[in-house]
Amino acid sequence: MQTTTFFKTLSAAALAVVLAACGGQKDSAPAAASAASPAADNGAAKKEIVFGTTVGDFGDMVKDQIQPALEKKGYTVKLVEFTDYVRPNLALAEGELDINIFQHKPYLDDFKKEHKLDITEAFQVPTAPLGLYPGKLKSLDEVKDGSSVSAPNDPSNFARALVMLNELGWVKLKDGVNPLTASKADIAENPKNIKIVELEAAQLPRSRADVDFAVVNGNYAMSSGMKLTEAL
């Protein structure tokens, strides 16, 4: 990444306030991404910063914590909220955004490789965790042969869901599998015949009415009104 005065200022101000406000939350730290060579970056002369986020805790983080801190330094902050995990990185690469905050680093790495994007991690922030939530069944003890579980359909988050199911003993992954890249092909055993339903992450909260359990990303859980304490 080409380091600029703009991104040095942004990273220092944003990271300081995020860590102060959210340091107690747990999960793999999501990456704030920036264009590796931002065409619109004019160094210290740039005064408007366009953030891209997904709905939920990421947008709230920008509005409640990062934006006030940057405005005190004389910047204008514009927030663009997306309803999916695809458009924020494409918009960043196309120059519509200066920075985005919505993803963890494995997702960023997979996405930019697949789409051949010249974007890079700027800094990391905490977020609400991925969780297994009740659907038609309300407790882990109710799992039965043929139970259905919805999960994110993007590779990195689907891998996290598989690791979660493996830890519960609902499926068994092959020995030595990389937990960051696990896929259905890495399932060695499925003793409960779990039916995994892959969906866009934004659809997972609504899917709970149709499946027995749902693996839901934290930001979409919060934006849909779910309580993180509902996770099993």
Stretches with model-predicted labels:
Residues 110-122, 137, 210, 215, ...:
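Ligand-binding "clamshell"
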Residues 17-21:
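C-terminal motif of bacterial Sec signal peptides marking the signal peptidase cleavage site
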Residues 79-90, 177-206:
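Short helix-initiation/N-cap motifs at beta->coil->alpha
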Residues 93-103, 147, 170, 192-195, ...:
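Alpha-to-beta junction loops
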Residues 122-171:
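A conserved helix-loop-strand patch within extracytoplasmic ligand-binding domains
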